[in-house]
UniProtKB/Swiss-Prot annotation:
Signal peptide: none annotated. The UvrABC repair system catalyzes the recognition and processing of DNA lesions. A damage recognition complex composed of 2 UvrA and 2 UvrB subunits scans DNA for abnormalities. Upon binding of the UvrA(2)B(2) complex to a putative damaged site, the DNA wraps around one UvrB monomer. DNA wrap is dependent on ATP binding by UvrB and probably causes local melting of the DNA helix, facilitating insertion of UvrB beta-hairpin between the DNA strands. Then UvrB probes one DNA strand for the presence of a lesion. This is UvrABC system protein B. SUPFAM superfamilies: C-terminal UvrC-binding domain of UvrB (SSF46600), P-loop containing nucleoside triphosphate hydrolases (SSF52540). A motif (Beta-hairpin) lies at residues 95-118. It comes from the Bacteria. Residues 433-599 form the Helicase C-terminal domain.
Length: 663
């Protein structure tokens, strides 16, 4: 059961065009020469993802793509999945739907207990990613910055797997014990991730990374007679296999001897820390730490886990104090390729993770809520992250100075295959700017296109949205106080045409495709600061670069250095594209992209109301209740072996989920 050597197969009818062939060739040349760090400077709409897909296919190395948020990760995951249907394309983001970290505020003597809700679907994706990385080389993992957080020792995860093979001697009871040790639970009634059921000489296992199929293991005496992968719902045989690896139900599982040794070390460190608190005359902290830690030790000894077990991860991993945690990067082979997308945003996030985490935990340790080992349950420091890089491509329309200084090569991708030019940029005075804005948006409306308006404050965003609404323009505002569900719904409304304009402070500068947007209006463009920096202006102007009528209006009474640089760069890119179009006889065309592509799995618990609701259903909440009811009905049929009825109900559930964008 070695690592699969299957090659990447890029499936597409498209051929590289514009600057793509040149960029692909140069990036590959650099990689093959051993260049460690390089940058792909690709303008919005130039097809950077397609370029990267070609590089991945030709270079043929396991690849990790890191982006700065879940929505962009999901968009890239979906695009790579379509381009590489025969290869392992995986999605690795934080599995929390809700997360309130443990904290202590000494000024108020207030302890906040950790509270979290884990999304089982995202947890399945994470297991699927680590299993693919360990079992095959034709793998692309698209991850958020959560990939630098502790994940458990890869050696334990890999070595503890149960290797099933047809014909091997294996006692059925021993297999059941092993499954329990790996964190699997017996469940003879429902099909759930990381469970198993037993009927006579047959064990059925639902793996940790999927609920689509189950593994049926048939015994004859003490021998594995047959291993079959079956459809989890209708129990049809998918295929019979010679071997199958069952991986642990958690990334944090450790062998029993390791656990026993870890508990001894925890107790030893506890005694020393309690002694230290007492020597400082801090009896309350000493007593608190002793009681809490001894309770955790007993829970781990009896049940194999406790609340907040990650705070003891250093002991289970065999790490010394201060040593970095194991992360997703440690699961990859040494020759992996790293791609950091939207690097000007992702790099600062990677830098900031460690300090933010440490300041919170130091208080917990200082006041006796946690042992000092809690400080080692942390994300990687930025320097530690860099040490784990083999070869990296930074990707951005506006790379940061840090990436550019480190890169041995900067590969430009300015020309778009569609022939689309960068938006026309106009600077207009602030006087009567709102009247001018209304006039421009009405022109956009006539063409059935959309607009984005950027302000400098949340209050101004709301006021402008109200002003536009009063003038019969369908406008809504977006700012940081809106949660991700509301933001996702707003984007969908804009793309579908339910609204004409979104007004906001920091509007979707990076990544998301909004081909319907032909106008970007930047209010107070001459106010210097982060939101009006060169990078911010280029990214914002780029939001209108996927439409043939793309235009950016900068309302300002003076031209700042950032504005001047952004305008010059946009004009330079327009000129390059114009010359290319003229030379090759290309007529620019707007990008067309179905709206459904925008928000399918970005947040797996996010929903949006369909235009036409099913009969008897009045709201999105009703649909969710209906799905829940049908799922119970489906499993009831399945348990009674009425698979045809179960399949019909499953199809009905699929239709409802599709309406909600959850398909």
């Amino acid at each position: 059961m070695g690592v699969s050597e299957q090659r990447f197969k890029l499936k597409t009818n498209l051929k590289p065009a514009g600057d793509q062939p040149k960029a692909i060739k140069k990036l590959l040349e650099n990689l093959r020469k051993g260049v460690k760090e390089q940058t792909l400077l690709g303008v919005t709409g130039s097809g950077k993802t397609f370029t990267l897909a070609n590089v991945i296919a030709k270079y043929n190395k396991p690849t990790l793509v890191v982006v700065h948020n879940k929505i962009l990760a999901a968009q890239l995951y979906r695009e790579f999945k379509e381009l590489f249907p025969e290869n392992a394309v995986e999605y690795f983001v934080s599995y929390y739907d809700y997360y309130q970290p443990e904290a202590y505020i000494p000024e108020k003597d207030l302890y906040i207990e950790k509270d979290a809700s884990i999304n089982e679907t995202l947890e399945r994706f994470r297991h699927s990613a680590t299993i693919s990385v360990l079992e095959r080389r034709d793998v692309i993992v698209v991850a958020s910055v959560s990939c630098i957080y502790g994940l458990g020792k890869p050696e334990h995860y890999e070595n503890l797997r149960i290797k099933l093979q047809r014909g091997i001697r294996l006692n059925l009871s021993k297999l059941l014990r092993k499954l329990v040790e790996l964190g699997y639970q017996r469940n003879d009634f429902a099909i759930k991730r990381a469970t198993f059921s037993v009927r006579g000489d047959v064990v059925e296992i639902v793996p940790s990374h999927t609920e689509d199929y189950l593994v049926r293991v048939e015994f004859w005496d003490d021998e594995v007679e047959r291993i079959v992968l079956m459809d989890a719902l209708n129990r049809h045989v998918i295929k019979e296999v010679e071997e199958y690896s069952v991986f642990p139900a958690s990334h944090y599982i450790a062998p029993r001897p390791t656990v026993e040794q870890a508990l001894k070390e925890i107790e030893k460190d506890l005694i020393e820390r309690v002694k230290w608190f007492k020597s400082q005359g801090r009896e309350v902290e000493a007593q608190r730490l002793y009681q809490r830690t001894m309770y955790d030790i007993e829970m781990i000894r009896e049940l194999g886990h406790c609340k907040g077990i990650e705070n003891y991860s250093r002991y289970f991993d065999g790490r010394k104090p201060g040593e970095p945690p194991f992360t997703l990067l440690d699961y990859f082979p040494e020759d992996f390729l790293l791609i950091i997308d939207e690097s000007h945003m992702t790099i600062p996030q990677l830098r900031a993770m460690y300090n933010g985490d440490r300041s919170r935990k130091e208080k917990l340790v200082e006041y006796g809520w946690r042992l000092p080992s809690a400080l080692d349950n942390r994300p990687l420091k930025f320097e530690e992250f860099l040490e784990r890089i083999n070869q990296v491509i930074y990707v951005s329309a506006t790379p940061g100075d840090w990436e550019l200084e480190r890169s041995e090569a900067v590969v430009e991708q300015i020309v778009r295959p569609t022939g689309l030019l960068d938006p026309v940029v106009e600077v207009r005075p602030k006087m009567n700017q709102l009247e001018n804005l209304v006039k421009e948006i009405k022109e956009v409306k006539k063409r059935k296109e959309r607009a984005l308006v950027l302000t400098t404050t949340k209050r101004l965003a709301e006021e402008i949205a109200d002003y536009l609404t009063e003038r019969k323009i369908r406008a809504k505002y977006m700012h940081s106080e809106l949660d991700a569900i509301e933001r996702a719904q707003l984007i969908r409304e804009l793309r579908e045409g339910s609204i004409d304009v979104i007004v906001g402070v920091n509007l979707l500068r990076e990544g998301l495709d909004l081909p319907e947007v032909s106008l970007v209006a930047i209010m107070d463009a001459d106010k210097e600061g982060f939101l009006r920096s060169y990078q911010a202006l280029i990214q914002t102007i780029g939001r209108a670069a996927r439409n043939i009528h793309g235009k950016a209006i900068l309302y300002a009474d003076r031209i700042t250095k950032a504005m001047e640089k952004a305008i010059q760069e946009t004009q330079r890119r327009r000129k390059i594209q114009e010359e290319f179009n003229k030379k090759h006889g290309i007529t620019p065309k707007s990008i067309k992209k179905p709206v459904k592509e925008l928000l399918a799995i970005e947040e797996l618990d996010y929903v949006s109301v369909p235009e036409e609701l099913p009969k008897g259903v009045k709201s999105e909440e009703d649909i969710l209740k209906k799905i829940e009811k049908l799922e119970k009905e489906m499993w009831k049929y399945a348990q009674n072996w009425e698979f045809e009825k179960a399949a019909k109900v499953r199809d009905e559930i699929k239709k409802l989920k599709k309406l909600l964008g959850l398909d």
